[in-house]
Amino acid sequence: METEANSNVGQKGRFYLTKNIWVPQEPIENLNLKMSDIILRRMPKLPLGGVDALKAFPVLAELKKSHDKIKADLQYLLKHHEEIPALHEVHPRDLYVAGRAWRTFLLKIWGHEIVENTAAVPDTYAAISRIPGVHTALFSILHGYAEIVPHRGSAAGVIRFHYPLIVPSEPEKCWIEIGGHHFFWREGEPLVFDDTREHWVKNQTDQTRVVLIIDFNADMPFPVNLYTALRYNLIRHSTEVKAVRDRAAIGVPPRKPATERADGLISGARHMTEVATTSRPGKSGH
């Protein structure tokens, strides 16, 4: 968890390269947004939803293949719902929703695995690990009647992937708007978009929406790839991101992967069969 040494890291308007060295956030964001004009011309056409998203990024089908296992991980995680922090409790500058109506369970942040969290959802993390280039992954849990105000990411060249796992029974009443494009989620139907485009979310139902979010860098030609690689390493090794990683780790008990749970059930069934066989009365000679 957060230590005294980095308790101030994440102050609004600052980006911490080390505990004591920070730079103003706004110039960095402005540079990224200016670069995004260059990068955007080299990005795939986004946003894309459903089949179109999987055609453009077939490797993301790994999540659909593991849908049931990921859903089982999520159901286990939601038993510990009250322990899952709000986004602003993990990243204080990101106050897009008041209170705890938007909770996030981070698995990976800019290349740092949060081992305490991935142990609770092993099959989910295994599926994510089969997708090359993923640097950030999390469960995004939005409560009923919550709204995420318009915002935009500052990391140009990052592709964001939403994989819906729990959606309200009236999906058209829980939606996201991305750069003027209106989408609503359906379970198992992915959505891919450019995080630097302004987007906002509204849940007009009394039901919870949960999506698995993963971020990865788009392939860029030389020399643009040098810029995105430099930015990635600066962010990854910053005290800012390390502080987020530490805050995000919570104490949800570990869960065995599905294969181990299945092996345990088989072993248990065999043991019960053996016990029943050995305890069965033999034929009497009298």
PLM regions with names:
Residues M1-R152, R209, P223-H286:
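Fe(II)/2-oxoglutarate oxygenase catalytic core
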Residues I141-G144, S154-E170:
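Short, conserved beta-strand element in jelly-roll/cupin
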Residues I148-H151, F193, H199-T205:
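Short beta-strand His + acidic residue motifs that chelate non-heme Fe in jelly-roll/DSBH
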Residues R160-P164, V192, Q207-P223:
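A short hydrophobic beta-strand segment most commonly corresponding to one strand
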Residues I166-E187:
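A short beta-strand-loop-beta hairpin characteristic of the jelly-roll/cupin
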Residues E170, D206-Q207:
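Short strand-connecting beta-turns/loops that link adjacent beta-strands
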